[in-house]
Amino acid sequence: MAKKKMGLLVMAYGTPYKEEDIERYYTHIRHGRKPSSELLEDLKQRYKAIGGISPLAKITLEQAKQLEKRLNDIQDDIEFQMYLGLKHIEPFVEDAVRQMHEDGIKEAVSIVLAPHFSTFSIQSYNERAKAEAKKLGGPVIYTIDSWHDEPKFIDYWVEKVKEVYASMTEEEREKAVLIVSAHSLPEKIIAAGDPYPQQLAETAKLIAEKAGVKHYAVGWQSAGNTPEPWLGPDVQDLTRQLHQEKGYTSFVYVPVGFVADHLEVLYDNDIECKQVTEEIGANYYRPEMPNANPKFIDALATVVLKRIKL
């Protein structure tokens, strides 16, 4: 019997492919407003500080390809065909949906490479995909809202956290704290009943409990540069506060809201948070990001198959 064909729409934030893309990329993020020359220069310096344009573009594509392969390897009923759709740079979400339609794909399942639901992120991706599909008259898209508590996803982080704690002396472990974080969003989402903060708290609790970590805290990072209040505490402030109030001398940063090595992790954690730990005379740790690790890819595949009940 012929396999049923299904689109696999993998959506992500996107990143500049080369330095010349930085301005148009950030102009898109800023809803068509060009960044000032100062802001643009600051962004270029940040990319320079992490060794050049972030590897995110290559990693995202690799994650998507590996997910397609894994899904086709572990079941025989459906042949998945992957389409990559990005939020702020080509191929845009709409481009991917259009391509599916042109390829005759009637049904698709979509997953966003971010574990926690929010109206700002997951919902906006899903709405863009569905709006384009509706305009074209197909495909039907089965969206995934969240996978923040998927056991295999939690297990990936538990393993990485345990490795870090195992590298410490008993004395260091006693004064170590795990900081679990995600990208901050404007505070107004709370008033709207957005589950984003609650889902991050759930992920943090699951990881800490399963890894046997006594001391942990939830923080936010990479807040936007706008006048409105953003979710806090910021991870840098939290680091200083925990050191001052609790006397922690080792900090293990787990930016679970992200799934790859990119600017927010390589700069905001590995440079900015590390600078704070150096200022207060503490140790800095940051377990490796999921990227295209087979265990992480398997977690995503499990999430997709659960959504279409295979």
Swiss-Prot record:
Fe(2+) binds at H183, E264. It holds the Pfam family Ferrochelatase. Fe-coproporphyrin III binds at Y13, R30, R46, Y47, S54, Y125. Gene3D superfamilies: 3.40.50.1400. It is an enzyme of class 4 (lyase). One of its GO terms (biological process) is heme biosynthetic process. It catalyses: Fe-coproporphyrin III + 2 H(+) = coproporphyrin III + Fe(2+). It is found in: Cytoplasm. Its main location: cytoplasm. GO terms for molecular function: ferrochelatase activity; metal ion binding. Keywords: Cytoplasm, Heme biosynthesis, Iron, Lyase, Metal-binding, Porphyrin biosynthesis. Pathway: Porphyrin-containing compound metabolism; protoheme biosynthesis. Signal peptide: none annotated. Its EC number is 4.99.1.9. PROSITE patterns: FERROCHELATASE. InterPro entries: Ferrochelatase, Ferrochelatase_AS, Ferrochelatase_C, Ferrochelatase_N. Involved in coproporphyrin-dependent heme b biosynthesis. Catalyzes the insertion of ferrous iron into coproporphyrin III to form Fe-coproporphyrin III. Belongs to the ferrochelatase family. PANTHER family: FERROCHELATASE, FERROCHELATASE, MITOCHONDRIAL. This is Coproporphyrin III ferrochelatase. It comes from Geobacillus sp. (strain WCH70).
